[in-house]
C-alpha cells in the first residue's frame, strides 16, 4: 500500500521503520516481512526503500548489514539513537558514511548532533536530525509553533534536518499535554501541513 501511494503521489522514498529485523540483529529478518520482495516491487514502481536501524546494531554489523541491504535493493538507512558527539561517535558517523557511499546508499542520521560539514565529503548523507523535532512532543512541551517557525533560520542553515513533521492530533499550546502513546502537536493542522 505505501509503495503504491508513494508512486501515485511522486514520493521518491518510503521508510520501513522498526520491526523489519531482529531487535539486536540486523542480519535476522522478521519472518513476517520480505524486504527483498518489497524492494523489488518498489523499484518497479519507481520508489526507493529505506530501512530504520539502531546505531549500536549498525556499529556491530556495519559491513555485513550494508552489503546485505544493498543486495536487497535498499536505497538508504535511517540510523537512530546516537544521541552524543564524542570522538567514538564522530568516528562512527565517518565509517558509516564511507560504507554507505561504497554501497551507493543514502543516510539519515536521526538522533544525531547538528551538521558540521560532513555532507561536503559524503553527499549521500541526505539529512540528520540535530534539532528539537516534532517527536519531542512525546516527552516535552518544547516543540512549540514559535520554535517550529524559528528553526528553519537557526538550524536549517547548517544543512538538511530530519524534523518529522505531520502531527494530526492538534491542540493549542495551552491545551497541550505530553503523551508518548498518542502524541499531540501544538498549533493547527494547517500549520503542520505548511
What are the residue ranges of the model-derived segments?
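Catalytic cores of secreted or luminal carbohydrate-active enzymes
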Residues: 194
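Aromatic- and carboxylate-enriched substrate-binding clefts and catalytic-loop regions
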Residues: 17-188
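An acidic-aromatic substrate-binding cleft motif
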Residues: 1-4, 9
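Core alpha-helical transmembrane segments of integral membrane proteins
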Residues: 10-16
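Short loop/turn motifs at secondary-structure junctions
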Residues: 9-10, 73
